């Protein structure tokens, strides 16, 4: 394992002081003061995929199925990872009647227990954007007024940690997607906010539909028949 040393400088009065001594016939104690630059600076970020499920994949512009990651989805700021969510079987509910109307749709995403801690904390919000078949973002999942980008609500369970989840109301998206096919279908991109991607190493791991705490889409819908 490798350590990632991080510290913050509150103001220009902070300093890193190196104390040392020079060997000679008498005591010769010295110190070297490193005065910090309080401006934000980025040098380089590298990551090693050796001995991981991602080892065989190219480094850029590649889609990795969740099945190849142990049935997991991963978000990782700094290196730009996000997760695409698809709903290939949504239209199957149309077979249940002549007309189907979605009343409500809720998406729950369960962070994998053990991948976060008091130090590597869960973000208060994550976000969903709507993208076409070429992963071009066309819109965002918004609040019930249709104005603000909806941040997934973090619901914590401090007793049964596996019950901690993010909740999204995706009713309008599912209504729009029902009955579409081919190039008219869309997916959802699960992401952090832009500041997290450019300024942090925040990360999130969660299960797909086959994981220990699977991602869940709950649909409430009505079926109509003509007699």
How should each PLM-predicted stretch be described?
Residues 1-227:
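Secreted, disulfide-rich extracellular signaling modules
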């Amino acid at each position: 394992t490798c350590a990632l040393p991080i510290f913050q400088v509150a103001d220009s009065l902070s300093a890193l002081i190196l104390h040392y001594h020079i060997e000679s016939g008498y005591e010769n104690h010295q110190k070297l003061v490193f005065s910090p630059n309080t401006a934000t600076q980025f040098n380089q970020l590298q990551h090693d995929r050796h001995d991981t499920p991602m080892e065989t994949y190219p480094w850029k512009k590649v889609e990795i199925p969740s099945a190849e990651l142990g049935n997991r989805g991963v978000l990782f700021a700094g290196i730009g990872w996000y997760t695409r969510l698809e709903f290939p079987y949504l239209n199957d509910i149309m077979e249940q009647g002549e007309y189907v109307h979605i009343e409500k749709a809720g998406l729950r995403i369960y962070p994998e227990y053990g991948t976060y801690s008091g130090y590597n904390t869960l973000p208060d919000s994550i976000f969903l954007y709507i993208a076409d078949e070429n992963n071009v973002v066309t819109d965002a999942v918004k609040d019930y007024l249709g104005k603000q980008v909806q941040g997934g609500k973090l619901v914590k369970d401090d007793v049964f940690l596996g019950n901690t989840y993010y909740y999204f109301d995706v009713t309008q998206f599912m209504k729009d997607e029902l009955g579409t096919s081919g190039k008219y279908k869309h997916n959802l991109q699960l992401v952090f906010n832009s500041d997290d991607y450019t300024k942090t190493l925040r990360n999130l791991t969660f299960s797909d539909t086959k994981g220990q705490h699977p991602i869940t889409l709950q649909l409430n819908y009505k079926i109509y028949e003509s007699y």
